[in-house]
Amino acid sequence: MGLQACLLGLFALILSGKCSYSPEPDQRRTLPPGWVSLGRADPEEELSLTFALRQQNVERLSELVQAVSDPSSPQYGKYLTLENVADLVRPSPLTLHTVQKWLLAAGAQKCHSVITQDFLTCWLSIRQAELLLPGAEFHHYVGGPTETHVVRSPHPYQLPQALAPHVDFVGGLHRFPPTSSLRQHPEPQVTGTVGLHLGVTPSVIRKRYNLTSQDVGSGTSNNSQACAQFLEQYFHDSDLAQFMRLFGGNFAHQASVARVVGQQGRGRAGIEASLDVQYLMSAGANISTWVYSSPGRHEGQEPFLQWLMLLSNESALPHVHTVSYGDEEDSLSSAYIQRVNTELMKAAARGLTLLFASGDSGAGCWSVSGRHQFRPTFPASSPYVTTVGGTSFLEPFLTTNEIVDYISGGGFSNVFPRPSYQEEAVTKFLSSSPHLPPSSYFNASGRAYPDVAALSDGYWVVSNRVPIPWVSGTSASTPVFGGGILSLINEHRILSGRPPLGFLNPRLYQQHGAGLFDVTHGCHESCLDEEVEGQGFCSGPGWDPVTGWGTPNFPALPKTLLNP
């Protein structure tokens, strides 16, 4: 049956399911560890579904990102506005008309869009949703560190074939809330000795990365930073105030968040959320800070999508955003990954610096046809974000040089090819590293990550008014490098009349690690088998897929990144 016949029968197909296709045939639908099913959802219960509408001019958007992010380009720093981006990628009138008419015919009347018009979120009853999406069958699930409740379908859904040119995927059916990169160790026992520290605090970070008490925001510039929180994780103002009383006495700082975008819950504070806010605001001290709160319960079925839509609905945004969450690439559909990557590209075109944690599973490991392979994570593997790995002190209780934190995520994407900006650095690593794993374990031609690193081991956090030691993970290193260090550099750039850093990677790789401490010792974990025996990639001189170009050396890094 041809496309015209499918179009003529579009609304009858809502019920019949003929001329249908699966937008996400490769989406993994197995239940993640720690989640349990509570049974079928009530047919009259309401849920929200997010329809990702097909965008236009994505290739042109990619060209513009390259132009505004490359210091050698005459367009460098001339970022697009949200309205510019909307004009470029807005779905065609045919797409908007076709999808809206289809939804109205199905009874979906409570829908709202975003400024770019490429997402449409609708509230429907379970009964309506299952008729609209043949094959879907919604169940209640509970799980995750905060016992989050979600509604998902364990079965694949179909769309009318006539919608294939118009809809990338439907969010809110399969993907569970993303995982966090965070772990907590028992507190080590050590006898008190002069010069020792008993965990990473703002003063330890400032000492290691050469930040002085004067390296803080001016409080007068139009500078801001943000972190995103999911999984019903919330911070408490009282925890932030106590953290600053305990650890912020030797530098100027702000003791409250400037703005919360989304829904800030009233429940117990989460360690993840507390960590993000406290170290973002102590490394990037005295800089206006926003928190994006996307719990993924009532506001939207998929919290990460909810955050992306918030970015597409605000004209004036913080310059730097840090995110400490991710999923394995192989757990996500190609349609979802490619569309999210385009959303990250949109942010880069607008001059936003997005930093993602590289994860806490080293190179990762999974079995394909009985053979082990490394397991990259996304969005850490996106070519349009700056990914942050993790390090530890060489001597755990002294402020020394850094080595690899063995859990630091890193590797090579199985989805995205290697971007041109890192061609030289990655080629050099692959040709010179004496400790490469067998080639069958990784895709040597893929986007390689992380790009940079920072301390990720042994942090102090205040949560629910209790100081908690030895919290670790790239969830810790990301706000330190991203919001903190880069926001301070943006402060200097803005005060001198320059644009903010924007998408950092093209410039970062052109500088060949200038302004960073090179981390050259240590390897991260991987598959426990006879071939690699638990060892993934190892660090070495220059860029490597464990710590990237290294960790920040503040006096040198601003000099590198201030001009042009």
UniProtKB/Swiss-Prot annotation:
Cofactor binding note: Binds 1 Ca(2+) ion per subunit.
GO molecular function: lysophosphatidic acid binding; metal ion binding; peptidase activity; serine-type endopeptidase activity; serine-type peptidase activity; sulfatide binding; tripeptidyl-peptidase activity
Compartments it resides in: Lysosome; Melanosome
Catalytic activity: Release of an N-terminal tripeptide from a polypeptide, but also has endopeptidase activity
Residues glycosylated per entry: 210, 222, 286, 313, 443
Active site: 272, 276, 475
GO cellular component: Golgi apparatus; lysosome; melanosome; membrane raft; recycling endosome
Full protein name: Tripeptidyl-peptidase 1
Lineage, broadest ranks: Eukaryota, Metazoa, Chordata, Craniata, Vertebrata
Recorded name of the encoding gene: TPP1
